[in-house]
Amino acid sequence: MAMRKILVDETNRELCEHGTVGFPMTVNHDDLWAFEGKSVPIHWHNDLEISLPKEGEAIYQVYQKSYTVRPGDVLLLNRNVPHSCHSPNNSHARYSTFLARPDFIYGEYGSDVERRCFRPFLQNSSVPCILLTSGNSCTRTVIQKLNETEDLFDQKTFCYELKIKGLLCEIFGMILCEHQNDLAKFVPANQLELERLEQMLNYLNTHFESIISLQELADQIHLSREVCCRLFKKMTGKTITGYLEEYRVNQSLPLVQSCQYSMIQIADMTGFSNASRFARAFHRQFGCNPGEYNSLKLQKC
């Protein structure tokens, strides 16, 4: 079975369009074990995202904070927010993901719905996500309506598009009203920080095969090395070294799976200084050595 992969550009912006031009929303039935490395690497997109756990635990990294979501919880991710996802101890985690373009829900930009209801969330850097926890009556109602939305999307009966839009308006109305006090603490989104992160990710992803110095990276965004490190950590929750190691290991997967190269060759092709460092980094991420990866993967199919 082919492993799923989030397709991104050099800045880690997701390339996949969610839904269609005429109906810009979709529902994915996700399983972390179906993704390469049993995790979703850091990425971001312009759409709103809701995660509805079905089985197991998933840990979302949003900026510097981790959110553990379980069945009975709901996580709403704001647009343009870098995020990643993994499960503790590589355990199974199944969840449904709802993705929608914001204007599909609020309609015309500048309308009262966009300006009064959505703008305090969409342009608020202090609310990158909203976690609805189990045991709350609002959460239970939201889950019920998300399940209705999922059923309609899967069955695609007559007028399912209209019914889904109505349900999404109800869902977002409940979530935003429930967190009205949080939205009142408005901090305008810092577009410059996102642009600088894009520049750093672009440089790291383009030059991962080479030795990259922190000074080189800092020079790309005209900041000191210290500020560069703080900004990267703030926006991704990861250190630059940790991100680069993870990215290099992910880039090594197709080479490992091809069985055409030695560990020394793969280490050299993916920017590791030697095979031992590559093997250790691979083991940290996947829990096995590169040589064991293919056989273990076959056993679990």
Residue ranges and their predicted role:
Residues 114-167, 202:
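Amphipathic alpha-helical segments enriched in hydrophobic/aromatic residues interleaved with Lys/Arg
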Residues 80-103, 110-113:
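Ligand-binding loop in jelly-roll beta-barrel domains
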Residues 174-179, 199-249, 261, 265-296:
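Basic/polar phosphate-binding segments, predominantly the helix-turn-helix DNA-binding elements
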Residues 1-74, 80-81, 89, 114-116, ...:
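Generic protein-terminus/edge-of-domain signal
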Residues 169-185:
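Linker/hinge segments immediately adjacent to helix-turn-helix/homeobox DNA-binding domains
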